[in-house]
């Protein structure tokens, strides 16, 4: 495999733009042979209501080696975190770089080389000599500029920096936004947060900080929980010097997984939210490697089910069979194994190494915070107090409060651009 190979992770829920996203990203790559796409297609497999999603046969066009597919009936979809976990577990085959995007994107020409070059420009201090070295744990991430259907791409390429915008009233999870940078950047600038719709890094991130398949039906909370997990595992966030990818912010043309909203689904979503509350109300200095021993059987069972499911997908893709539903029952059954300690999830109860709570929810080590840095470290770094739900000026301006007047585009110009294409 080429040393510059890129694995592109895409999840699509009944999205007619996915096919054109795949076509665009391959056509505009400089080295098309280095691009390998793993896509989870969630659509109606029982009728032709989603035929619009398959006007372009990308699997036939590019081959099954370059396009790896999980097919799932849309009624079995369990939200973005679950789908992204399936793609990581079943379709990744050791490519060097990892690009995670949404199913409605457009790219600049030679985007593959641009992203690799910018990733290699990310530098961090060298503790040995006081100089700077390439950051091997760098992640390029931001909310991309928007595009309009069918292919209206803006001519400007302004960088976008992630900022904290507030806490959700219903769930209490941090919301993120994007501010347009007017300052000319020579190299990628440090960022405080991570987002799921554009993330480019070395592929070791898949094994180091994998998606948690137990966060079923979760939407808000995905990005800030991954931000905290990645940061505490030693990863650093950067915004590219210019726009490399575009996102369709208008959702009117497509369905979302929220169309399936039974009482059972609502309960599973609430359990996912509780998992994140546990994550943000623990002291990760008390997370130890022994937790993994308690979870080996659960994780092995989960992996075996995923492997079996992947084999089924490979054998049945052409028949459009639903090959992913068995994984969800495996994940749910594993979540029920707990030691019933009924520990409090508050920050003060720091003896809870297994991270159980009154609901029997347990966060396995590989889906937990890291040990390289603490959650308090991340709170100080990003300017967000997760316990008291406050944001200081550092968080509101993405770490560039002191130079905000010269770093960011003025609010009127930013409003005009956002109203035209969105961010």
From Swiss-Prot:
Q: Which GO terms describe its molecular function?
A: acetylglucosaminyltransferase activity; metal ion binding; Skp1-protein-hydroxyproline N-acetylglucosaminyltransferase activity
Per its Swiss-Prot or TrEMBL entry, what cofactor is needed?
A: Mg(2+)
Which reaction equation describes what this protein catalyses? trans-4-hydroxy-L-prolyl-[Skp1 protein] + UDP-N-acetyl-alpha-D-glucosamine = O-(N-acetyl-alpha-D-glucosaminyl)-trans-4-hydroxy-L-prolyl-[Skp1 protein] + UDP + H(+)
How does this protein's activity vary with temperature? Optimum temperature is 30-33 degrees Celsius.
**Binding site residues for Mg(2+):** 102, 104
Q: Note the effect listed for residue 104 to D.
A: Loss of activity
Enzyme Commission number: 2.4.1.229
Give GO terms for biological process.
protein glycosylation; SCF complex assembly
The effect annotated for residue 102 to A is: Loss of activity
Main location group:
cytoplasm
**Compartments where located:** Cytoplasm
Task: Report which superkingdom the organism of origin falls in.
Answer: Eukaryota
Q: Where is this region: Disordered?
A: 286-359
* Family statement drawn from the similarity comment of this UniProt entry: Belongs to the glycosyltransferase 60 family.
State whether it acts alone or in a complex, and with which partners, per the record. Answer: Monomer.
Give the miscellaneous note. Answer: Present with 4000 molecules/cell.
Q: What does this protein do?
A: Catalyzes the attachment of N-acetylglucosamine (GlcNAc) in alpha-linkage onto the 'hydroxyPro-143' residue of Skp1 (fpaA/fpaB). Is the first glycosyltransferase in the Skp1 HyPro modification pathway, which results in a pentasaccharide-linked 'HyPro-143'.
| Protein name (Swiss-Prot/TrEMBL) | [Skp1-protein]-hydroxyproline N-acetylglucosaminyltransferase
Please report the organism this UniProt entry assigns to the protein: Dictyostelium discoideum
Q: Which gene encodes it?
A: gnt1
């Amino acid at each position: 495999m080429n040393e510059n190979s890129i694995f592109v992770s895409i999840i699509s829920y009944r999205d007619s733009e996915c096919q054109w996203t795949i076509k665009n990203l391959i056509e505009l790559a400089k080295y098309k042979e280095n691009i390998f796409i793993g896509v989870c297609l969630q659509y109606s497999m029982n009728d032709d209501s989603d035929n619009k999603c398959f006007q372009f046969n990308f699997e036939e066009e590019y081959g099954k080696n370059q396009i790896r597919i999980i097919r799932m009936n849309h009624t079995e979809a369990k939200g973005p975190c679950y789908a992204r976990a399936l793609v990581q577990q079943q379709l990744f085959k050791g490519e060097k770089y990892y690009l995670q995007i949404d199913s409605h994107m457009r790219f600049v020409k030679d985007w593959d080389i641009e992203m690799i070059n910018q990733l290699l420009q990310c530098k961090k201090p060298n503790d040995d000599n006081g100089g700077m070295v390439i950051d091997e744990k760098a992640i390029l991430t931001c909310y991309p500029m928007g595009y309009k259907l069918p292919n209206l791409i803006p001519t400007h390429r302004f960088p976008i920096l992630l900022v904290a915008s507030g806490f959700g009233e219903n769930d209490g999870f941090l919301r993120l936004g994007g501010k347009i940078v007017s300052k000319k950047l020579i190299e990628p600038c440090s960022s405080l947060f991570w987002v799921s719709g554009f993330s480019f890094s070395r592929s070791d991130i898949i094994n180091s900080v994998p998606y948690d398949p137990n966060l079923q039906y979760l939407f808000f909370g995905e990005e800030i929980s991954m931000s905290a997990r990645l940061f505490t595992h030693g990863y650093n966030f950067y915004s590219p010097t210019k726009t490399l990818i575009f996102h369709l912010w208008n959702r009117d043309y497509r369905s979302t997984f929220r169309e399936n909203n039974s009482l059972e689904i609502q309960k599973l979503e609430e359990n996912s939210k509780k998992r994140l509350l546990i994550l943000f109300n623990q002291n990760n200095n008390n997370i130890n490697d022994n937790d993994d021993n308690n979870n080996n059987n659960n994780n092995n069972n989960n992996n075996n089910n995923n492997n079996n499911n992947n084999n089924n997908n490979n054998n049945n893709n052409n028949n459009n069979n639903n090959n992913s539903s068995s994984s969800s029952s495996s994940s749910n059954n594993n979540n029920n194994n707990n030691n019933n300690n009924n520990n409090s999830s508050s920050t003060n109860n720091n003896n809870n190494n297994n991270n159980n709570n009154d609901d029997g929810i347990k966060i396995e080590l590989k889906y937990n915070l890291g040990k390289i840095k603490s959650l308090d470290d991340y709170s100080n770094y990003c300017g967000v107090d997760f316990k008291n739900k406050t944001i200081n000026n550092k968080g509101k301006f993405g770490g560039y409060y002191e130079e905000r007047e010269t770093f960011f585009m003025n609010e009127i110009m930013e409003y005009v651009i956002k109203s035209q294409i969105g961010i």
